């Protein structure tokens, strides 16, 4: 089993979790192919993390299965937008930590 972790990535953890839940338990090659056609910022990022985890394991993407896909909350970047009469409104820019674990596929997983 091998894993890849990407921290402090500028994507909403709530939106990234939706994508991570979809790929958990999938074959790595099939997951990367399906994420390629998903119109979401998090999909491209998670696809690269899956490829990194497969490379860390030293496996072929066909022989790898995603055992765990986790997205945790990172720190929130706080910025301000100028408003009328000298006031300001806060903007919250969330970050996420993405962790993908892969393992070699058994005959039942394919």
UniProtKB/Swiss-Prot annotation:
A GO molecular-function annotation: rRNA binding
Pfam families: Ribosomal_L22
Highest taxon above the source species: Bacteria
Keyword Cell membrane in annotation: no
Key word rRNA-binding present: yes
GO annotations of cellular component type: cytosolic large ribosomal subunit
Subunit structure: Part of the 50S ribosomal subunit.
Protein name according to UniProt: Large ribosomal subunit protein uL22
